[in-house]
Amino acid sequence: GLTGCDDKKAETETLQPANSQPAAPAPEAKPTEAPVAKAEAKPETPAQPVVDEQAVFDEKMDVYIKCYNKLQIPVQRSLARYADWLKDFKQGPTGEERTVYGIYGISESNLAECEKGVKSAVALTPALQPIDGVAVSYIDAAVALGNTINEMDKYYTQENYKDDAFAKGKTLHQTFLKNLEAFEPVAESYHAAIQQINDKRQLAELKNIEEREGK
């Protein structure tokens, strides 16, 4: 296609001045071949980084799905554990609870790995929409919620609520609710985007199989 034309164009452009030069001592006039080699090499440079779109999309989806599973399930377990001993989940701890189970923490390494992994995947080109945009919102919300949950876990594990009559526990609960309210709708959108793209990929694979079998 285009590179072939560029090569011919480059050759004619470099060869023309050689022909139009005044009669120079015969075969020694061939140093003009060096620029020809340079001109031929130029079109190859932009053509080299060939992007395999499907490979990039697969890499992105692999990270997105793994991180969803690494974070979503532990978050649900944490919420269930916390709700176990609260009379009113929205109100939070009152200080009158007979049993205090605390809350399950979220793996800090999973939070850190997923934050780095998701943001690196989003930066890969070409973009994969709608999920790239949602993935950033999801990981930001998940990290904020995870950090608050881990602070709560430490507070309850160390039984600090016995020293401050749940004062910090009540403050942490308000931060937790704000984080949770931000996280839940984004998590739903993220899950929907994963399903939407997976459905498209499955349809594309089915078409490929049908085309191959048809032939």
Residues covered by each model-derived region:
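Bacterial signal peptide processing site
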Residues: C5-K8
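Extended amphipathic alpha-helical interaction segments
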Residues: G169-K215
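General "foldedness" signal
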Residues: T14, S78-R81, E159, A204, ...
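Leu/Val/Ala/Ile-rich N-terminal alpha-helices, chiefly Sec-type signal peptides and the beginnings
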Residues: K42-E181, E188
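Post-signal peptide N-terminal segment of mature Sec-exported envelope proteins
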Residues: E13-V56
